[in-house]
Curated annotation (Swiss-Prot):
This is RNA-binding protein 5. Residues 743-789 form the G-patch domain. Residues 411-422 have a biased composition (Polar residues). Component of the spliceosome A complex. Binds to ssRNA containing the consensus sequence 5'-AGGUAA-3'. Regulates alternative splicing of a number of mRNAs. May modulate splice site pairing after recruitment of the U1 and U2 snRNPs to the 5' and 3' splice sites of the intron. May both positively and negatively regulate apoptosis by regulating the alternative splicing of several genes involved in this process, including FAS and CASP2/caspase-2. In the case of FAS, promotes exclusion of exon 6 thereby producing a soluble form of FAS that inhibits apoptosis. The lineage of its organism: Eukaryota, Metazoa, Chordata, Craniata, Vertebrata. CDD domains: OCRE_RBM5, RRM1_RBM5, RRM2_RBM5.
Length: 815
């Protein structure tokens, strides 16, 4: 204390104080500011250390929860979008990017506020605005603004001079550069880039260890360096009932597309979407720009409520992982699937304005030259092989393996080559499936030999062939159709059915030829003359003729509706050419069969029955053909029953003023319908009449109850049951006030003990009531003291007494 310098009174006094006092005050203030800044810096360091520890040593589950808090309302999460951007600011290392980071935002700001502010500025508009939040929902003070192109981001930064004012606060803007992804891992199943700390794939749930083991080292670098861009992109996760118009509407803000630019792949059996579609653009640059726009959408692209995945149609991620041989196999399988989708969509949409070209490969793409060479070689080999089968069936055994190997490499030319086989024949579908049949232990390469006994077919051992839709029998090499129960031999191109008595496979055409020839039947019995059964070649020719007519009619309707594009014209020409070629081919066979039938037919004994008369080949039965001819003949004759010049109905012998009245008479008149029915029955033979009556009986509802009543009569109705009557038992209950209150009650005894005598009134001077109070019935709903509320009823009165008292009360009221 002695060493401290005491300030004198004169030094303390003064207007502004002494110089020493001012110096001490300045020193204390500077010391306080330094202490505050040191405390703030240390607190920031501690908070940063805690954040780093939380970020580095947290579990994957906690990290997933923290990142889920930053999701948008629709729940979309892109693994590696904003979480991979570097938040630290270094001006020297800043590079231009299409993503801009806004730092120093107010805590109360929202994403909608930032969007409204961005929309108020002129120039390019952002593609997405992302505000980073904590788990509690509070803003972390920075956000990301992403533009579609790098030029838009740089021009926007230059226009605002890297400064922005939001809610009166100056905001710093910087380019956001993503951190390197060398520590992330790529999923081998869905090709999604995942964080290094994620043990399972975010999209498909695949294990990280499996992906690292399957993908060889150096694959990721090779994938990034190879240029695998093409002019077609694929849309995945499409709803089963989505149409092309919905896809065009969803993509219209980003690209100008036509109907023929979109290929929606459908299932051949259910006619529903298979979950993906192709969008072809004019160039690879346009496809790359569209893909970049669609992948940067937040929220992502949605069509009919389904989130759509977008990628190049020919991606190098999967092709480079495979070996060269597997790559060619996958390449051909994909082409076959697209060709099959083209065939199914062409059949289902033939009446909706023509078919659409679903071919995926275009000239100039990778593998197109090799694929075209395979297609040409396969077609030449198939034509030679077909000629060899016609000349000598035994030559097929030496070339079956070659056919199989060629079908493995290129499976779709058989689908496009429609001029050699008519549509609908299993040749187009069974030939590609020979690649799968080589794995099964087939019998002889020549197939089933007629006349040889075989074991009973076991359908449980059959293998389903997706390319043809049939079931493959590995023991015989035949294809089984469960709908028609027929077998198809892909080598001889014949339909067969199983004969249980002979224990062999009998060709369908052979059975009809046996019926036409004079051979005696297997069962000998009474003689019966029958009309010949079906002529397979002749009826196939008629079916081909009807098919060609329908195609030509559809083509005429399509031309009259609107002018088609060139691709549709070529497709129509191919279909009409296939129809004409198929009709000419089967017409020759039909004429040959007709010439053979000109020989006088012998009387046949016994019944000739085809064991299988249903399904694919059973549709060519003789009865169905005669019915069609009969209907055509009757229709032509019915047209002659109307005289359109005189406007008269020759059948009903009536004349009409105009054409509309005649048509209305033919369609609505009961007289015309009755006469037409009589006319049709008169033109039929006895057998046709019996068949018609049988068909009508089968179609008509049979009232068995009416038949039973007509045969046995109506039984007499049973006597009604008498209702049981129960006598209600009388209940004796006490009525104490019915005969009046006597002197035996407790109240009377108490009053007598107090000096009261019967007949005198109550009270000291006996001025009170002399009779006991009686309960009276009041009128329902009447208030106390109202007129007519009570008319002297008591609880012990009977109904008769109550009526009498009520009548008397009303009489007195009237007076």
């Amino acid at each position: 204390m002695g060493s401290d310098k005491r300030v004198s009174r004169t030094e303390r006094s003064g207007r502004y104080g002494s110089i020493i006092d001012r110096d001490d005050r300045d020193e204390r203030e500077s010391r306080s500011r330094r202490r505050d800044s040191d405390y703030k810096r240390s607190s920031d360091d501690r908070r940063g250390d805690r954040y780093d520890d939380y970020r580095d040593y947290d579990s994957p589950e906690r990290e997933r929860e923290r990142r889920n808090s930053d999701r948008s309302e629709d729940g979309y999460h892109s693994d590696g979008d904003y979480g991979e951007h570097d938040y630290r600011h270094d001006i020297s290392d800043e590079r231009e990017s299409k993503t801009i980071m806004l730092r120093g935002l107010p805590i109360t700001i929202t994403e909608s506020d930032i969007r409204e502010m961005m929309e108020s500025f002129e120039g390019p508009q952002p593609a997405d605005v992302r505000l980073m939040k904590r788990k509690t929902g509070v803003s972390r003070g920075f956000a990301f603004v992403e533009f579609y192109h790098l030029q838009d981001a740089t021009s926007w930064m230059e226009a605002n001079q890297k400064k922005l004012v939001i809610q009166g606060k100056h905001i710093a803007m910087h380019y956001s550069n993503p951190r390197p992804k060398f520590e992330d891992w790529l999923c081998n199943k869905c090709c999604l880039n995942n964080f290094r700390k994620r043990l399972k794939c975010f999209r498909c749930g695949a294990d990280k260890f499996d992906s690292e083991q399957e993908v060889p080292p150096g694959t990721t670098e090779s994938v990034q360096s190879v240029d695998y861009y093409c002019d077609t992109i694929i849309l995945r996760n499409i709803a089963p009932h989505t149409v092309v118009d919905s896809i065009m509407t969803a993509l219209s803000p980003y690209a100008s597309l036509a109907v023929n630019n979109i290929r929606l792949i459908k299932d051949k059996q259910t006619q529903q979407n298979r979950g993906f579609a192709f969008v072809q653009l004019s160039s690879a640059m346009d496809a790359s720009q569209l893909l970049q726009i669609l992948q940067s959408l937040h929220p992502p692209l949605k069509i009919d409520g389904k989130t759509i995945g977008v990628d190049f149609a020919k991606s190098a991620r999967k092709d480079l992982v495979l070996s060269d041989g597997n790559r060619v196999s996958a390449f051909s399988v994909a082409s076959t699937a697209i060709a099959a989708a083209q065939w199914s969509s062409t059949q289902s949409q033939s009446g909706e304005g023509g078919s659409v070209d679903y071919s995926y490969l275009q000239p100039g793409q990778d593998g197109y030259a090799q694929y075209a060479q395979y297609s040409q070689d396969y077609q030449q080999f198939y034509q030679q092989q077909a000629g060899g089968l016609e000349s000598d069936a035994s030559s097929a055994s030496g070339t079956a393996v070659t056919t199989t190997s060629a079908a493995v490499v290129s499976q779709s030319p058989q689908l496009y080559n429609q001029t050699s086989n008519p549509p609908g024949s299993p040749t187009e579908e069974a030939q590609p499936s020979t690649s799968t049949s080589t794995q099964a232990p087939a019998a002889s390469p020549t197939g089933v030999v007629p006349g040889t006994k075989y074991a009973v077919p076991d359908t449980s051992t059959y293998q389903y062939d997706e390319s043809s839709g049939y079931y493959y029998d590995p023991t015989t090499g035949l294809y089984y159709d469960p709908n028609s129960q027929y077998y198809y031999n892909s080598l001889t191109q014949q339909y067969l059915y199983w004969d249980g008595e002979k224990e062999t496979y009998v060709p369908a055409a052979e059975s009809s030829s046996h019926q036409q020839s004079g051979l005696p039947p297997a069962k000998e019995g009474k003689e019966k003359k029958e009309k010949p059964k079906s002529k397979t070649a002749q009826q196939i020719a008629k079916d081909m003729e009807r098919w060609a007519k329908s195609l030509n009619k559809q083509k005429e309707n399509f031309k009259n509706s609107f002018q088609p594009v060139n691709s549709l014209r070529e497709e129509e020409r191919r279909e009409s050419a296939a129809a004409d070629a198929g009709f000419a081919l089967f017409e020759k066979k039909g004429a040959l069969a007709e010439r053979q039938q000109l020989i006088p037919e012998l009387v046949r004994n016994g019944d000739e029955e085809n064991p299988l008369k249903r399904g694919l080949v059973a549709a060519y039965s003789g009865d169905s053909d005669n019915e069609e001819e009969l209907v055509e003949r009757l229709e032509s004759e019915e047209e002659k029953l109307a005289d359109w010049k005189k406007m008269a109905c020759l059948l009903c012998r009536r004349q009409f003023p105009n054409k509309d009245a005649l048509v209305r008479h033919q369609q609505l008149s009961d007289l015309h319908k009755q006469n037409m029915d009589i006319y049709r029955r008169s033109r039929l033979s006895e057998q046709e009449l019996e068949a018609l009556e049988l068909r009508e009986r089968e179609m008509k509802y049979r009232d068995r109850a009416a038949e039973r009543r007509e045969k046995y009569g109506i039984p007499e109705p049973p006597e009604p049951k008498r209702k049981k009557q129960f006598d209600a038992g009388t209940v004796n209950y006490e009525q104490p006030t019915k005969d009046g209150i006597d002197h035996s009650n407790i109240g009377n005894k108490m009053l007598q003990a107090m000096g009261w005598r019967e007949g005198s009134g109550l009270g000291r001077k006996c001025q009170g009531i002399t009779a006991p109070i009686e309960a009276q019935v009041r009128l329902k709903g009447a208030g106390l003291g109202a007129k007519g509320s009570a008319y002297g009823l008591s609880g012990a009165d009977s109904y008769k007494d109550a009526v009498r008292k009520a009548m008397f009360a009303r009489f007195t009221e009237m007076e």
